[in-house]
């Protein structure tokens, strides 16, 4: 009996833990290390478990990060999540840079969202450690400037996905750095980067022609110069133009050349009329989500046009506040778009 118990503890339980752990949140998987010495050995020896380090919203994230990266098992880390780890500071990244033997060469994605105590110096330090980074999210770190973009473009040459949402001090200078260094960029989010102008962002659109996802939420200063340039992005599938108050039907007609669009948010694009939406209907025949929320210049005519081209694909349609559309009850909309399951994008 004792021998059977010994086999159970030494072999069966660790094997079960090894099978279960990849399906658990990382924090739960880490807790399994304390079950027994045998579980510890088996789990530590599984490299897949240690490709992600999730310190989201944790207390003392800087000290935890330094401790974790000192361990051999995190030598091949691919994803580091520090989102809302608000006590992380420049000094933690600078300390990592100065430590011998610390390398993040395998890191592919870094999430620093809302780490408000990070400055340009912190960005310089952390990006110097991860030259092969492919995705970087620095949402709502309002103190960052174009200097951070300079550090990112200098240290991380392979970025494909860049989220700058809420970085209000980024200017056209930063956009030019992106345009000149990331011509293979796939995803860009510049929500509320309010210092940007047509001139700077046009350079991005001209040089980053592989863009698939573009989020321009709450950027009311751009004009049709930018929107017409978007029409040249042949691979674009996601476009958020919420609050683009200067977008006209002419600009939207150019965007209709993006035939692969599946997501288009035109909420509060107040200059748009049926003319622009009909152009979208004719050019973008694979739309799955479309928001026309708050546009008073559109009528039932644009929905008729959309139903001819997108009834087979559209699952989300928001026409709330579109007072020119008279037949906008759920029943009316489902008659035109049988696959609709969502009728509100914005609450």
Segments from the language model and where they lie:
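Inter-repeat linker/turn residues at the boundaries of leucine-rich repeats
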Residues: 48, 75, 86, 102-105, ...
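A structural signal for leucine-rich repeat
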Residues: 68-72, 93-102, 123-129, 149-155, ...
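C-terminal interaction modules of eukaryotic adaptor/scaffold proteins
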Residues: 286-290, 297, 301-347
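N-terminal adaptor-interaction module of cullin-RING ubiquitin ligase components
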Residues: 1-101, 105-114, 119, 123-127, ...
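Alpha-helical scaffolds that organize eukaryotic protein assemblies
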Residues: 110, 121, 127, 131-169, ...
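Conserved hydrophobic beta-strand positions in leucine-rich repeat
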Residues: 53-55, 78-83, 107-112, 136-138, ...
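Short, solvent-exposed loop/turn at the beta-strand->alpha-helix junction
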Residues: 35, 59-65, 86-94, 116-121, ...
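N-terminal/domain-start segments enriched in small and hydrophobic, helix-friendly residues
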Residues: 274-292
């Amino acid at each position: 009996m004792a021998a059977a118990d010994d086999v159970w503890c030494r072999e069966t339980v660790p094997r079960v833990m090894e099978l279960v752990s990849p399906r658990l949140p990382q924090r739960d998987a880490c807790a399994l290390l304390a079950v027994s010495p045998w579980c510890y050995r088996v789990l530590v020896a599984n490299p897949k478990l240690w490709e992600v380090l999730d310190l989201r919203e944790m207390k003392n994230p800087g000290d935890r990060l330094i401790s974790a990266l000192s361990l051999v098992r995190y030598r091949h880390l691919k994803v580091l999540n520090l989102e809302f780890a608000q006590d992380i500071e420049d000094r933690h990244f600078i300390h990592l840079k100065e430590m011998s033997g610390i390398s993040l060469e395998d890191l592919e994605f870094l999430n620093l969202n809302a780490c408000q105590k990070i400055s340009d110096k912190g960005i310089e330090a952390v990006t110097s450690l991860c030259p092969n980074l492919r995705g970087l999210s620095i949402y709502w770190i309002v103190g960052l400037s174009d200097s951070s973009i300079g550090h990112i473009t200098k240290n991380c040459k392979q970025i494909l996905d860049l989220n700058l949402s809420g970085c209000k001090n980024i200017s056209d200078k930063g956009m030019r750095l992106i345009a000149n260094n990331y011509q293979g960029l796939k995803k860009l989010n510049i929500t509320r980067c309010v210092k940007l102008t047509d001139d700077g962002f046009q350079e991005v659109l001209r040089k980053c022609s592989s863009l698939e996802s573009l989020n321009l939420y709450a950027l009311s200063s751009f004009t049709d110069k930018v929107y017409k340039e978007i029409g040249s992005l042949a691979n674009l599938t996601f476009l958020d133009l919420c609050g683009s108050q200067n977008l006209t039907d002419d600009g939207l007609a150019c965007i209709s050349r993006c035939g692969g669009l599946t997501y288009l948010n035109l909420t509060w694009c107040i200059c748009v009329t049926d003319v622009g939406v009909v152009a979208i209907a004719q050019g973008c025949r694979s739309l799955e989500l479309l928001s026309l929320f708050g546009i008073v210049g559109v009528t039932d005519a644009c929905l008729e046009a959309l139903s001819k081209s997108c009834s087979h694909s559209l699952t989300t349609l928001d026409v709330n506040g579109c007072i020119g559309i008279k037949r906008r009850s759920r029943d009316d909309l489902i008659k035109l778009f049988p696959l609709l399951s969502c009728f509100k994008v914005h609450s």
